[in-house]
Amino acid sequence: VRTPAEIRDEYIDSLNHIRSAYGKICGQVGRGHLLSFPDIHKLSEGLFLSALTYWEALCRDLIVTDLATVSAGVLRSEIREFRTKNAPYRLAERMLNHPDHPEKFVEWSSFESVVSRANEFLGQNHRYVLTQVEKQDLAKIKKVRNAIAHKSDKAWESFSALIRGDPFNLTGAQCRGVTPGRFIYAHQWNGATVMEKSLTTLENAARTLVP
């Protein structure tokens, strides 16, 4: 069983691997190199999704660990002794999963959903507290993720509104032909590429949850 610090460190290691891979492929783009711009856009989408998938796993694994170990949580406050060492972790996972799991699942990509479950199962003094700016940035990242993962009209409309609004402010001409991968690779977010800023935001959030 991993500690919260181990869960955080494994996640940050994953982000560092993604950063390294992204840096390498960015150096192989254009004339005379291995990758075309459409190639780098698709690869950027894949790495971006990987970072978000690991983030979802971090949130899920952290809250399961907290529910299994924190005395103020509903599990430990109701049950003093367990038959086996790992029983609280198995019970915590079942309690936090969707009732119809695995056919349906909790949307761990939504931090608000994580906070809601923490409030319900862990009480008010839990670790799942981020600044308003951090939560807004995670919401932006989630919209990009949804545009890659879902391909639905709703996801695309949300993505289009995002890139036209602050802080990206893409013009109509810039939006023409844009894809999530092209946006991640080619556009800036507070002085860094969208990919770089997103990875930094996710790492900072992980360090806030587990100092």
Label the model's feature ranges.
Residues K24-L35, I40:
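Short, Lys/Arg-rich flexible segments
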Residues L34, I40-V144:
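Helix-loop junctions and short alpha-helical segments
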